[in-house]
């Protein structure tokens, strides 16, 4: 087999750098990835916009992650350390340049505190201020001397303390004492914002997860599972063993520069407490307390290691609304906004309408997903049509039904599902710039095909940003609440040019070329291009495709799957004859990307959407291309799809 490499010299997934299949020895050692510290590092392309490096141990992960977060090359937007890998995400355009630079930096990280000078001095000028701050905010040396040390007070009265004592052959007090005696380090962020996987657990306390996960673990629960320790930032289902509780706030989205108390590289000490004490951090300077009580709330989500619950359907509870940065806080605020002209008044919604933009960048290392529009191409297209910046906030409408009134004359554009739309009774074409007069009303019908429609208005939707983005993240309960009748949305000034002039168009021919799928996400076209009523999802091989047996690997590219009813923005779930893993060996958690196709134990693929967890513990066997992601965003329950892996 002959390997294909991009210009960065990185092999396709499933192939060694020398061109041999994974797990087979190379006959050309000079082409292998370089040996660092006596161990081979394996680099692979992941999808259109990421690279993954396999590393020998958690210490190497810490060094590489630290070096890349401290000096990210231009074009890199996120660095995601995990158990034995580091995933680097960046721009799809020019990946060979930033991937080569990232590889040089990573392979030059010779020690815990060494950051090689491998990026041009003006590199920071190529990143937005928000991305630069996020990417460098976690650049902390992982070990002594001078490491940041965080003390977390714990009341040891957990529901599983007695069971852990029994499994370990210890008393309850001995379990608590051994937990306190540990010296922990943050290895990586996990399934939800602020959830940090801590290494350094006493081997005597290494116990299995619960056979049946709890439906609710309270915020502040101090827990262990396998070789890791952690603190739950928010209430959630989970299968870890609970030793105690803390009142320490682990994650606060109001702190833009450092929303998570713990970042990779931090050292953690648990101290016994019998009264409320806030966390202390020592890094050579006094710090204000982070807070004392985590706000109430629950998100239906799971740790990446809790495989029985991975990528669950997510629902935000009513109490979470206090955490969400809602578009409009009060009826009085609505009335005040309505008195101005540059607003959109929501008269009615269909099943779901969200505010979305390009998402949150640079925060994956502390468990914050990127989120953003379900179809990034549609977001850019809609914004281009009205002369906005590519990342301006739009409305993402699920199954139509939206009715809005414009307070001032503006330009709008609709992109996505095939549906009827009218402004004051006059038809509106999908994928075209349209003038909306002051006081006019836009009504969206139910789509004949497809699922999502994006509405862009000139200037963008000016919802309050949370952690640098106006996007609603249903997994993490970040960003604006779903829209409701009566909401009034301010229009911003995210301009970048003039609206595109509407051209005469043959309505029947709209989206009649293959490029229209990628350009506008036209849903009718997707079905016409499919095989009968099977929608083809273009994809590339995933980094763990070799974890399938030979028959399943071959079947992966021809199997027709059915989209299930529990699909959402977190993941598209597929049903069909299950795939078979080549072995039952557990896979350490590693970073995920939009469009990653993961195969859990039941063998039925899960295709991750924009609100996916940051890390996952199942093999990623394929990754959708940009065109595949566009088509995925339009899939309804019952649709039939096939992965076209190239």
Predicted regions and their residues:
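Conserved "landmark" site that anchors the functional core of diverse proteins
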Residues: 2-14, 20, 24, 28-646
């Amino acid at each position: 087999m002959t390997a294909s490499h991009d210009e960065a010299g990185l092999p396709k997934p499933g192939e060694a750098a020398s061109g041999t299949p994974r797990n087979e020895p190379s006959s050309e050692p000079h082409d292998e990835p370089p040996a660092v510290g006596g161990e081979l590092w394996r680099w692979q392309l992941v999808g259109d916009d990421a690279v993954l490096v396999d590393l020998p141990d958690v210490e190497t992960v810490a060094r590489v992650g630290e070096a890349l977060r401290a000096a990210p090359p231009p074009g890199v937007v996120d660095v995601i350390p995990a158990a034995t890998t580091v995933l680097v995400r960046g721009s799809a355009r020019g990946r060979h340049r930033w991937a080569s630079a990232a590889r040089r930096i990573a392979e030059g990280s010779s020690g815990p505190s060494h950051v090689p000078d491998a990026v041009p001095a003006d590199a920071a000028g190529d990143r937005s201020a928000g991305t630069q701050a996020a990417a460098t905010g976690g650049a902390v040396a992982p070990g002594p001397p001078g490491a940041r040390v965080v003390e977390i007070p714990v009341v040891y009265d957990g529901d599983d303390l007695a069971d852990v004592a029994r499994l370990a052959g210890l008393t309850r007090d001995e379990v608590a004492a051994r937990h306190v005696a540990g010296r922990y380090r943050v290895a990586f962020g996990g399934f939800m914002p602020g959830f940090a996987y801590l290494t350094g657990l006493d081997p005597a306390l290494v116990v299995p997860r619960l056979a049946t996960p709890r439906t609710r673990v309270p915020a502040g629960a101090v827990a262990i599972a396998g070789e890791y320790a952690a603190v739950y930032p928010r209430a959630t289902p989970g299968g870890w063993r609970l030793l105690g509780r803390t009142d320490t706030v682990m994650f606060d989205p109001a702190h833009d520069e450092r929303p998570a108390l713990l970042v990779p590289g931090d050292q953690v000490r648990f101290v016994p407490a019998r009264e409320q004490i806030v966390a202390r951090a020592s890094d050579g300077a006094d710090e204000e307390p982070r807070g004392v009580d985590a706000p109430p709330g629950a998100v239906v989500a799971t740790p990446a290691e809790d495989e029985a619950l991975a990528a669950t359907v997510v629902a935000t509870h009513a109490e979470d609304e206090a955490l969400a940065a809602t578009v409009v806080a009060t009826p009085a605020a609505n009335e005040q906004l309505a008195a101005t002209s540059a607003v959109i008044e929501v008269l009615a919604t269909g099943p779901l309408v969200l505010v979305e933009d390009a998402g949150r960048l640079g925060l994956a290392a502390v468990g914050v997903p990127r989120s953003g529009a379900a179809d990034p191409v549609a977001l850019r297209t809609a914004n281009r049509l009205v002369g906005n910046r590519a990342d301006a906030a739009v409305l993402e409408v699920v199954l139509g039904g939206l009715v809005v009134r414009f307070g001032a004359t503006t330009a709008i554009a609709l992109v996505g599902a095939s549906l009827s739309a009218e402004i004051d009774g006059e038809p509106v074409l999908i994928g075209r710039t349209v003038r909306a007069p002051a006081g006019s009303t836009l009504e969206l019908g139910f789509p004949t095909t497809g699922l999502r429609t994006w509405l862009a208005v000139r200037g963008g939707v000016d919802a309050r940003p949370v952690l640098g983005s106006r996007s609603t993240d249903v997994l993490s309960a970040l960003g604006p609440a779903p829209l409701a009748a009566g909401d009034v949305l301010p229009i911003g000034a995210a301009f970048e040019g003039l609206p595109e002039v509407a051209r005469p168009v043959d309505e029947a021919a709209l989206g009649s070329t293959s490029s229209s799928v990628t350009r506008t996400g036209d849903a009718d076209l997707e079905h016409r291009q499919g095989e009968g009523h099977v929608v083809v999802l273009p994809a590339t091989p995933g980094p763990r495709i070799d974890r399938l047996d030979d028959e399943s690997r071959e079947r992966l590219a021809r199997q027709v799957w059915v989209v299930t009813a529990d699909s959402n923005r977190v993941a598209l779930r597929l049903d069909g004859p299950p795939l078979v893993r080549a072995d039952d060996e557990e896979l350490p958690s590693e970073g995920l990307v939009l469009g990653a196709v993961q195969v859990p134990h039941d063998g039925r693929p899960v295709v991750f959407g924009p609100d996916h967890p940051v890390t996952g513990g199942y093999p990623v066997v394929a990754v959708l291309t940009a065109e595949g992601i566009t088509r995925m965003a339009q899939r309804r329950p019952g649709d039939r799809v096939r992965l076209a892996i190239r």
